[in-house]
Amino acid sequence: MDMAQAVQENSVDEDNKRFVPDEVWESIEEVEETLEFLISQYGSFEGPLVYPVILKETRDNIGYVQLCPIDNGNWEIGYHIGKKYTGNGYATEAVKAFLPVITKQAGISEVYGICLVENVASLAVMRKCGFVNVFRGIDKYQGVDREIVKNIWKA
């Protein structure tokens, strides 16, 4: 399966639609345009900094890990593993490998992890990767007031 097809298929699972609705692509063409843009960002550290998660054994693209600039010079981590690959520790492995390297290269000293309170899988990944809770309550998430958790990781 090629990269664009894998990204598109992983993006339309129900968990992805619920937790990151702005990262759902209905067509391969949309994915190809997005991938072209993301790849163009690899030469700078302005962001977003998005990298595929590749399964070692099969070389399949099973998801992504990313850092995105948010407000006031802060950065937020994001990650998604395709539904058929979840529950195997891949997100935790990817985040643990990604954060120290990308933050050192980009000169970033802290990263936020923000998710909905009900996204227990994402909260578990952040906890396992050393994030510390700094907020739990109502705030904007995807432009809507929702109950969220904000965690922080420090290099």
Task: Give the ranges of each region predicted by the language model.
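A short hydrophobic/aromatic micro-motif that marks alpha-helical segments and, especially, helix-coil
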Residues: 27-29, 42, 145
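Secondary-structure boundary/capping residues
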Residues: 25, 44-47, 111
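Conserved GNAT-fold acetyl-CoA-binding loop/helix
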Residues: 15-37
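A short helix-loop-beta-strand connector motif used in the catalytic cores of GNAT acetyltransferases and
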Residues: 37-52
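Acyl-donor (CoA/ACP) binding surface of acyl/acetyltransferases
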Residues: 1-18, 50-155
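Short, conserved alpha-helical segments within structured domains
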Residues: 26-30, 49, 118
